Swiss-Prot record:
Species assigned in the record: Sulfurimonas denitrificans (strain ATCC 33889 / DSM 1251)
Phylogenetic classification of the source organism: Bacteria, Pseudomonadati, Campylobacterota, Epsilonproteobacteria, Campylobacterales
Record-listed Mg(2+) 2 binding positions: D116, D272
Official protein name in the record: Phosphoribosylformylglycinamidine synthase subunit PurL
Annotated binding of Mg(2+) 1, by residue: E92, N538
Annotated EC: 6.3.5.3
HAMAP family: PurL_2 (MF_00420)
Binding positions (ATP): Y51, K90, D500, G537
Domain of life, per lineage: Bacteria
Annotated GO biological process: 'de novo' IMP biosynthetic process
Amino acid sequence: MSQQLQEIEKVLSSHKLSGDDYAHIKQILGREPNLVEIGIFSAMWSEHCSYKSSKVHLSGFPTKAPWVIQGPGENAGVIDIGGGYAAVFKMESHNHPSFIEPYQGAATGVGGIMRDVFTMGARPIANLNALRFGDVLKDNKTSAHQRYLVRGVVAGIGGYGNCMGVPTIGGETSFDECYNGNILVNAFTLGLAKSDEIFYGRADGIGNPVIYVGAKTGRDGLGGAVMSSDSFTEESKSLRPTVQVGDPFTEKLLLEACLELFKTDHVVGIQDMGAAGLTSSSFEMAGRSGSGMIMHLDRVPAREEGMTPYDFMLSESQERMLLCAKKGSEAEIIKIFEKWDLDAAVIGEVTATGNMELFWHGDKVAEVPVNPVSEEAPVLNRPMSRPAYLDKIASVTIDDFARVPNQEAFERLTKSMEVVDKSWIYTQYDSMVQTNTIKKGGMLDASVVRVKENGKALAMSADCNVRYCYIDPKGGAAAAVIESGRNVAMSGARPLAITDCLNFGNPENPEVMWQFGQSCLGIKEACSALTTPVIGGNVSLYNETNGVSVFPTPSIATVGVNDDQNKVLMSSFQGEGNTLYLVGESNSEFGGSLYMKEICGVVAGVLPEIDYEKELTLWDLVIEANKKGILECAKDASSGGVAIALAKMAAVSGLGCSARMLVNDERDIFAESMSRAIIEVKQENSASFESMAGVLQCQKLGTVGGDIVKINNVSMSMKELQDNYFNTFKRVIERDI
């Protein structure tokens, strides 16, 4: 083999490009590519940027509704919330960086998703997160490392969000051994904008200037997009230099400068520099517009000496934006950003060539056609194979295991890391900044912010039961959409749209691709049935270490609108003597349940039945009854069943309860049948509520009050329950410090 060929193979390998990719690149260019061009193709055709393995499965997602202003394909999705305002939101992953460097990985994940939102012209008003960690309970190195990761990720999220002045108002955190080698950090941001003042990532108008704004460019994050498109091995700690370093104070200045700029008429288009940095932002803007672009890389503000064109194109330095502006507005734009102590430089212009032409001190260092890179990346229809494990686990039931006394099961489940209060996490976040948050964490099934401008409230919830997704990828993904929507409805808001973050293992494994394909089918089915279109999202693949993939984890965040910000429904008990109802049909359904995991020690069984009509009827009941003012609180009965839902309601409120649930088996108080809620009403409203419940099963459970929680044959004092609920998490996570 010639030395030249060896060098080419070495370069291709380091850029995760195949021989076929190289041949395709030569065909596109009509010549051999240089290193800058190889870097561009590598980044833009990476799994992270191109979605080449997932795109074929994402087609067909429902994306339209009368209230959808912008669906997938932009920096974030946009829905009309009435009164001239729009909610702009998106969810993205920062999994690989957070495993390598938890603080910076999580922090820059938060920073990146906020830029996606404010680049659309919206001021961020709420953050959520969905976090998955491995086993934190054992006294071994793996669990100790997971506890370290929890502490680092939470500190990173809080450190960035708090400095930005954007409240982090909720989220979801769960633990499973499948995440020992790959934690998942999914960040969500929602912003508020006027519905007729949305900005898009376009580069229209031949001759219009292309302007770089924000922080200077360094070498941090080089190769980040490619790193996030590969699985981990024992050597992955060496990837620390590929993790970006964030500066929230600079991002705060960038936010305010952009919002000031948006009040002018200077902006044609604007794009965040996220994964693949200047490469992705420039190619995406030109690609959407069908235009070309010239950029002079020596004009890009540099933070380090000796940087090359390759470095400038692929750096993932944070807090940067690319603008396409109206010609003649350059000086005024630069003045705005300099006022905010930020860099701004005219680095190029829009052309009609359809090519990206890059110059370095007057010399052309790259010329690549835009469309084949941004819009025509390879699409892979990877082989799929149904995993053999599904047949083995489908027949497993709780009757295959020795019975555990219900009281013992109740005591163990109230200490489950999935159940217990996560205030150790959310008290590190500023949840009340901007003064729009309605109630602190743990008091609502959804997280809610008021919209002062129109008197409404926005409710949001991020959810995914990964055990459901493991035993039934299609049904589990549908269940994630359902539960996320149900939590929003339990707060009194009407669910309107979702964003997703699809976290899966290695797509080169046919079983993983089958899980992914089935999950997409489940999301399509649920969103269509519930009329909650997908308006944006993210795919994160290669969540695998040493051949072990994470469980399918399609995180779903639903956003809904409550027409009256004064009628937000709590999820904990509100008053002594109030009546409790269980709405919805209960069966002995334990597949993928918390009970099976914690008490039986397995993740197995058949998923509880899904009935979209019953689900929508439940949502309508809660939303309409809340409008009439006859509800005191509503809580989704899901993980851990009715018993654990009641325990949580009691722990948060400080009020006990006495409940009697009709069951076929005493363990059914822990069963997880879907489309159920626990409702609290005042006695004088009982008849009205029962009348409204209509066709739904409505069982009177009992009453609120007392200093114990009792349901059927289990009970616990409020003192013990609140100790379990509020202190367990801290005891576990701070064990090493």
